[in-house]
Amino acid sequence: MLNLYAAKWCIHCKKTEDFLKRNEIEYNYIDIEVQADDIVKKVIDVNGGFDWVVPTLEYKGIWRRGKIFNETELTGDLKKMGVSD
């Protein structure tokens, strides 16, 4: 299942979550503000050492760095990750 690493204050996280719901893509919402340090460190590492870069996505070990919401780009990235057709 797709993992969405996000924060409640992040508008791009909310837009990504709305997109996933609208497209009926199952996901786990992982609030990085309440996670163990090792999980937060992994998200930071995936994002090149930058702190609080969300939304970050992970699917079967394939990571997508946190980005500003762009529906076209997200659709393409999810296809590349194998999440959707």
Predicted regions and their residues:
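Thioredoxin-like thiol-disulfide oxidoreductase module
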Residues: I32-D51, L78-S84
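Short, structured active-site "lid" loops
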Residues: V43-I68
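Small/polar loops that bind or transfer phosphate-bearing groups
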Residues: Y5, D31, G66
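Local sequence-structure signature of Cys/Sec-based thiol-disulfide redox active-site neighborhoods
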Residues: M1-Y27
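Conserved beta-strand scaffold positions in the cores of enzyme catalytic domains, especially
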Residues: Y27-Y29, W63
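Non-catalytic, surface beta->alpha helical segment in thiol-disulfide oxidoreductase systems
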Residues: Y59-D85
